[in-house]
From Swiss-Prot:
Superkingdom to which the source organism belongs: Eukaryota
Subcellular location field: Nucleus
Assembly: Component of the Mediator complex.
InterPro entries: Mediator_Med10
Alphabetized UniProt keyword annotations: Nucleus, Transcription, Transcription regulation
Family to which this protein belongs: Belongs to the Mediator complex subunit 10 family.
Gene Ontology CC entries for this record: mediator complex
UniProt keyword annotation of Nucleus present: yes
Listed name of the protein: Mediator of RNA polymerase II transcription subunit 10b
Length: 189
């Protein structure tokens, strides 16, 4: 292959995007940027459609036989913009929960749904934290009881735990793994 040709290679980017870089060092648009651009185009089309609907409303409310041509032009403009919006929306893949759509249909604020979801997550997190704390307290209590009755075995247990933790920590550092199990990722800019 001729080295002067521009071939593309996919390079992993941050936050789940794919960045393509050519041999000459230039990079093309990311996948996330494409979806943002598509969404922006759909939003602009919706705004244009709303503007055309407003103009159509004004034309209809002040309709006279002489303004019939103007009304037909506005209707054609609305049909063209709705067609454009449909074509643009096919490029967007956005999933909206049915609960949000039902709230909108009921005339309620969809932010309430988001607030309720966050509050339920916080509540479940608190329950999980409570369970974790209860297990920590139980472990601490059992170790205290065992230490009173079997001090030598508890000392051996603590030595084994300490050496095991040290080995795990060294292994994690050598493999670039965070203590919580996540892998370290180098940012590519």
């Amino acid at each position: 292959m001729d080295p002067t040709q521009n071939t593309s290679a996919g390079i992993g980017g941050s936050n789940g995007t794919i960045r393509y870089q050519t041999n000459d060092g230039t990079s093309t648009v990311t996948v996330a940027d494409d979806s943002k651009e598509n969404l922006s185009q759909v939003i602009n089309s919706i705004e244009k459609t709303l503007g055309v609907l407003h103009q159509l409303h004004l034309t209809v409310t002040s309709f006279t036989p002489a303004s019939q041509l103007h009304l037909l032009q506005r209707l054609n403009s609305l049909v063209m913009e709705l067609d454009n919006m449909t074509k643009l929306s096919e490029k967007c893949n956005i999933q909206i929960p049915m609960e949000v759509l039902n709230l909108i249909d009921d005339g309620k604020n969809p932010d309430e749904f988001t607030k309720d979801v966050l509050n339920s997550c916080i509540a479940r997190n608190q329950v999980t934290k409570g369970k974790t704390d209860a297990f920590k307290d139980l472990r601490k209590h059992i170790l205290e009881e065992l230490e009173q009755n079997f001090p030598d075995e508890v000392d051996m247990y603590r030595e084994i735990r300490a050496s095991s933790a040290a080995v795990t920590k060294r292994l994690a550092q050598s493999q670039s793994v965070l203590p919580n199990g996540d892998a370290k990722v180098k940012n590519e800019l």
